[in-house]
């Protein structure tokens, strides 16, 4: 039996883990810094020493190093500088395009510099719910504009009329004229590849002197897709390293639930034919017209899948913070080859696990494997260079991801494997590995031919350290990633778990507790309750009929031969009571005494700063918010699916999406009360939940510069919202958000939107759903 370690010993062991972390990989000399930008469908341009990306909705950004991006523009508007030229703007310049496409926005463009030194933007607009689109050219002397329209070159969606090939437009076989990529081939010829869903991806030859298509090509030549198959975002890159042209596309739907994933095929000619690693002709890849629209199953087996939804999951006790590093619906990429360094880059947008539809640009380096197929570095580019990887930095535990071949919204979470010194692989999968040359690797696993790829040293943003990674793909077109974990002994792992293990807010528990049973490196946590009738060994809570009961929970952490124990005191309270009361009488204290005081934040929930003041309230003082300040409340204020939130509000102004009370389990699961809602409820005040969207519009706005009492009750999905004691909304199936005792809560701010300006007073939180009379009582 192992002797429990003292707290002093735990701290020393944890410190030694941290020190060792600096020597577990062939680390770079400096720590990388990143600055993020949001450009959907980023198309890359190198002009001088600056990289530009241009994307949908006229968004753009620039960077000197592919790591730190500066947002230049975002959103189609009359003031967007890319088209602003005196009295002219994007709406006047592209009036024909907007009129044809029945829209006021733009889709993914591409910008290329031609022989005259000018920059040619290939812009496009689409109706959205139909492939009625226009694609044209605008020209500027600088990548940053202003661009001057030269005219539309292609249209689609001319229902019942002759299309460019002389036949009546048919969306099953003719393209949607969007998503252009213009490129020079190895012989100096200019081409444009384009298309999205509908009839597929097409390519046509362009005149390098004018940038316009050569005549009599119709829509050009189809390369892949058709019958409304979900294939889009085509981009072609030539690699001198292999003498192949690589056709990148994105399969699936672009939103967080669409299963977007990047794939590649190759050809010795710019206009094909293109083949995948199994030798399948991509021209034959299309949906089955006899099946329902957007038939993903028919196209999923084809192409070399480079990346799908994944998460290098950080488990309890592993280095770093948060859930780990991963992507959701990464795609619509561009690519760039650097002739000076021989590096290949993949530039794409991505969403993220537990962050909904938020998206940012990411750049990853690509490497050509032994079979001439590009494999993508698992982590974002941090100025790494392929180099010899020494054996002592290869052996060890890895987080392993197999991207599969399917099109799915599911996130593939990492598994734990070990690359052993004898060439075996053990853990979640079994197989063999061997290093080839300086940094090539071959990995043999069940279910596929040999995975061929590279080993490299990369910056891991989760552990904030350099780690060894591998990336490889098989002849079946399946990609795998690996990320080496910091070497630790069993006791070091157990110690790290001990230090991080927490149950969150445990002073006013009324709902079931989430008791973790697994942790880093497959460690096991078992639980024992001092009073199973109140809190079971699995965290099931039975509330007392009156008062409160204290329960001791003991966690036993086991990793190999190492064992540690940690205890927690949990206070379980009766249902129906007030659990928190913030009166704001000159401070942010909980007058009920169950929770700690709030703290002042800046203009976002996770940003420091802010300046909170106090003024006259409904009772005593109130908290006064200046439009740049929030209040961070204690975690775990609500931890069940039965609760009431009540407060007095006096907004100084109404701005869309601005929150007053905000609570979240994650950035993708939250509840928010808005004095002014979105357009879906006509801008009315609303209780809002996402990203399992729920709109509880009140049909009115609480007034500016007047006090209004707002309350909402939730009872296992039944929801009611009240203003001044009067029920304004009643519904069912409200999302169950607060399933843990670690939820995040705030007033006046969230992660994204304009902060609240006005006053808040008398915030009360109950662990029960008050009835109509009870709500009316606290409102008067």
Region roles according to the model:
Residues 2, 573-627, 776-780:
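Extracytoplasmic low-complexity segments
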Residues 358-360, 722, 751-760, 772:
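Extracellular carbohydrate recognition
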Residues 686-709:
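Short, aromatic/His-centered strand-loop micro-motif at the edge of beta-sheets
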Residues 239-241, 706-720:
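Localized edge beta-strand/strand-to-loop motifs within extracellular or lumenal beta-rich domains
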Residues 26-492:
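Carbohydrate-active catalytic/glycan-binding domains of CAZyme proteins
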Residues 488-575:
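Beta-rich interaction/scaffold domains
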Residues 576-579, 588-592, 626-685, 704, ...:
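Extracellular glycan-recognition modules
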Residues 731-759:
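Flexible glycan-contacting loops in extracellular carbohydrate-active proteins
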């Amino acid at each position: 039996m192992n002797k429990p370690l003292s707290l002093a010993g735990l701290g020393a062991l944890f410190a030694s883990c941290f020190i060792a972390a600096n020597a577990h990989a062939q680390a770079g000399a400096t720590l990388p810094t990143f600055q993020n930008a949001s450009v959907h469908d980023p198309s890359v341009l190198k002009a001088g020493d600056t990289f530009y990306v241009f994307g949908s909705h006229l968004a753009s950004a620039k960077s000197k190093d592919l790591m730190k991006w500066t947002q230049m523009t975002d959103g189609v508007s009359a003031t967007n500088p890319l088209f602003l030229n005196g009295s002219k703007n994007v709406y006047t310049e592209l009036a024909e395009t907007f009129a044809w496409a029945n829209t006021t926005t733009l889709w993914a463009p591409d910008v290329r510099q031609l022989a005259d030194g000018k920059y040619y933007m290939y812009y496009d607009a689409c109706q959205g719910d139909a492939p009625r689109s226009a694609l044209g050219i605008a020209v500027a002397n600088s990548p940053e504009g202003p661009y001057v329209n030269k005219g539309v070159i292609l249209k689609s969606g001319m229902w019942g009329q002759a299309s460019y090939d002389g036949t009546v437009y048919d969306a099953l076989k003719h393209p949607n004229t969007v998503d252009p990529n213009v490129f020079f081939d190895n012989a100096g010829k200019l081409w444009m590849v384009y298309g999205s869903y509908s009839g597929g991806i097409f390519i046509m030859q362009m005149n390098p002197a004018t940038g316009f298509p050569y005549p009599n090509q119709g829509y050009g030549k189809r390369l892949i897709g058709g019958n409304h198959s979900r294939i889009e975002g085509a981009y072609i890159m030539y690699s001198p390293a292999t003498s192949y042209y690589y056709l990148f596309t994105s399969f699936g739907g672009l939103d967080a639930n669409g299963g977007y994933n990047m794939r590649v095929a190759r050809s010795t000619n710019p206009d094909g034919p293109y083949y995948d690693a199994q030798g399948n002709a991509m021209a034959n890849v299309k949906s089955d017209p006899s099946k329902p629209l957007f038939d993903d199953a028919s196209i999923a087996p084809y192409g070399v899948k480079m990346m799908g939804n994944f998460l290098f999951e950080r488990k309890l006790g592993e280095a770093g913070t948060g859930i780990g590093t991963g992507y959701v619906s990464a795609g619509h990429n561009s690519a760039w080859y650097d002739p000076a360094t021989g590096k290949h880059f993949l530039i794409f947008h991505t969403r993220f696990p537990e962050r909904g539809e938020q998206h940012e640009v990411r750049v990853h380096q690509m490497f050509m494997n032994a079979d001439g197929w590009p494999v993508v570095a698992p982590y974002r580019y941090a100025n790494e260079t392929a180099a010899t990887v020494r054996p002592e930095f290869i052996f060890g535990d890895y987080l392993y991801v197999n991207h599969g071949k399917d099109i799915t919204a599911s996130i593939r979470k990492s598994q734990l494997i070990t690359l052993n010194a004898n060439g075996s692989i053990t853990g979640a999968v079994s197989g063999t590995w061997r290093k080839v040359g300086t940094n090539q690797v071959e990995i043999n696993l069940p279910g596929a031919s040999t995975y061929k790829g590279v080993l490299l040293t990369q910056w891991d943003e989760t552990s904030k350290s350099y780690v060894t990674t591998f990336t490889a793909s098989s002849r079946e077109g399946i990609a795998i990633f690996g990320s080496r974990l910091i070497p630790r002994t069993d006791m070091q792992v157990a110690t790290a778990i001990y230090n991080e293990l927490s149950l969150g807010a445990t002073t006013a528990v009324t709902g079931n507790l989430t008791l973790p049973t697994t942790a880093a490196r497959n460690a096991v946590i078992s639980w024992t309750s001092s009073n199973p009738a109140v809190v079971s060994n699995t965290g099931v809570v039975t509330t007392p009929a009156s008062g409160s009961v204290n329960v001791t929970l003991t966690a036993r952490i086991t990793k190999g031969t190492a064992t540690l124990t940690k205890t927690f005191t949990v206070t379980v309270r009766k249902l129906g009571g007030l659990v928190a009361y913030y009166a704001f009488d000159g401070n942010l204290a909980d007058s009920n005494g169950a929770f700690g005081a709030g703290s002042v934040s800046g203009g976002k929930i996770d940003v420091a700063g802010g300046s909170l003041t106090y003024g006259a309230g409904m009772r005593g003082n109130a908290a006064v918010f200046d439009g740049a300040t929030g209040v961070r409340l204690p975690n775990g204020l609500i931890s069940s699916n039965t609760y009431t939130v009540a407060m007095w509000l006096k907004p100084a102004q109404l701005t869309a999406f601005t929150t007053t009370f905000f609570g979240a389990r994650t950035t993708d699961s939250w509840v928010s009360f808005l004095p002014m809602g979105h357009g879906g409820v006509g801008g009315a005040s609303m209780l809002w939940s996402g990203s399992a969207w729920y709109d509880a519009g009140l049909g009115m706005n609480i007034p500016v510069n007047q006090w209004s009492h707002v309350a909402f009750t939730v009872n296992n999905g039944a929801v009611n919202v009240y203003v001044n004691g009067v029920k304004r909304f009643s519904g069912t199936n409200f999302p169950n958000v607060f399933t843990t005792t670690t939820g995040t809560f705030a007033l006046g701010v969230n992660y994204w939107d304009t902060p609240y300006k006005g006053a808040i007073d008398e915030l009360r939180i109950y662990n029960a759903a008050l009835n109509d009379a009870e709500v009316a009582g606290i409102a008067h």
